From Swiss-Prot:
It is found in: Cell inner membrane. Part of the high-affinity ATP-driven potassium transport (or Kdp) system, which catalyzes the hydrolysis of ATP coupled with the electrogenic transport of potassium into the cytoplasm. This subunit binds the periplasmic potassium ions and delivers the ions to the membrane domain of KdpB through an intramembrane tunnel. The gene is kdpA. It comes from Escherichia coli O127:H6 (strain E2348/69 / EPEC). The chain crosses the membrane at residues 5-25, 63-83, 132-152, 170-190, 253-273, 283-303, 329-349, 356-376, 379-399, 416-436, 484-504, 526-546. InterPro entries: KdpA. This is Potassium-transporting ATPase potassium-binding subunit. Belongs to the KdpA family. Its main location: membrane. It holds the Pfam family KdpA.
Amino acid sequence: MAAQGFLLIATFLLVLMVLARPLGSGLARLINDIPLPGTTGVERVLFSTLGVSDREMNWKQYLSAILGLNILGLAVLFFMLLGQHYLPLNPQQLPGLSWDLALNTAVSFVTNTNWQSYSGETTLSYFSQMAGLTVQNFLSAASGIAVIFALIRAFTRQSMNTLGNAWVDLLRITLWVLTPVALLIALFFIQQGVLQNFLPYQAVTTIEGAQQLLPMGPVASQEAIKMLGTNGGGFFNANSSHPFENPTALTNFVQMLAIFLIPTALCFAFGEVAGDRRQGRMLLWAMSVIFVICVGVVMWAEVQGNPHLLALGADSSINMEGKESRFGVLVSSLFAVVTTAASCGAVIAMHDSFTALGGMVPMWLMQIGEVVFGGVGSGLYGMMLFVLLAVFIAGLMIGRTPEYLGKKIDVREMKLTALAILVTPTLVLMGAALAMMTDAGRSAMLNPGPHGFSEVLYAVSSAANNNGSAFAGLSANSPFWNCLLALCMFVGRFGVIIPVMAIAGSLVSKKSQPASSGTLPTHGPLFVGLLIGTVLLVGALTFIPALALGPVAEYLS
């Protein structure tokens, strides 16, 4: 079993790096504002038709464009969901959503969280899925990538006050990165058996003679960007454990690769744009070390089995509860870590049925800020915050002003870094406390004791860190939970983006200083260890007390 797990992890990472390297080169061209070959004419026509100016923006203008697009998208999606019964492509005649569920869903998909307090096949029409959710899957992913484009330019430009043009970046990211790659993945999914149709739900007779209604829909097109954009919201309630979304072992492997593809490629792109590929490899090493350790812990915990079932005399020591037998324990464990290390949230197994330790690791990966590969764009700019913090700590230890890539990290940048890092822990801890203090919060818990608290903590952690997965034993479709989680999702997304853009605006105006004998190298194993230690230290200090009340207490009981 150990050999199989090692081979699975090694194969996954090897194929990932092979695919991400060339994509990283393409992203580096876009960051450097170099059009991809053959796209100049198309871009010129599009920019002229849409009235888009390619004039560069300062950080406030860039941020305003990103926020404006997302707020407009939120409003459009909200009203679309409220009135979906008036819109076409609704063969099941599904009604509009309640105001609180529509708000929660709109915020969820605009913020790249894709938390779902509903069952897709019984709640949303084909039009809502396509024109509403799938469109936001593209736009939310493009927004995250655009923000990291701006931050990378801030590190590599000198004595400037502009960070690029947000509209140009968003168009290029959507047209030349997300759309073609998602199209290829969707075609592969269709070939493997993922649904792509507009048929009404089909009534069939099962082998037992019973009648069953099979849901249909344009699944493959949404499934592709759901994974590539680290969105994670399933077309069906069972998400990627549903055979109509994820029918084969090959589609499952491709889905895992798609989740990590752009976050990995952005690390390669960062190294190229910075003029030192070792900087990108340093980030990949730090992320990969944490990732491999977490996968190993989850695999070990799930292979050991559920001690309560073993005490009752169960034959198997492997915890298969809540898992698809066609995927098994090892693949389910790997997928769980992939989807929570990135801010994806898609699932092929029920995380609520994992063992106490097996469920704690995905929860902790979200709580540290989704920085282990992370979401498209958001993972890298989240990790860059920890890089700045690690550089600051190292500067304190050696008595020098901290600097990164030749740029001095001053008080303003550190205040903004601390603010950005503290946003999501504050939301998680205060949100969980509020839920446990109120009758409306506690009434949604289906399990008592430590596991019930773990379900609450997981839900708020998932929302605040824009992941979207859940411990499913929580009845979250209520006005209290829909509003609480919508607030966590919105502030967790834009409460981090705003200080990140402010940091970018501050750094882009500075000159790069040449390295001296006292400069801390930020590309070697020493800094990799320091960065990992910083991530672990912040995560441990912030969440150990809360985790002790949930999964740790459950494990010890």
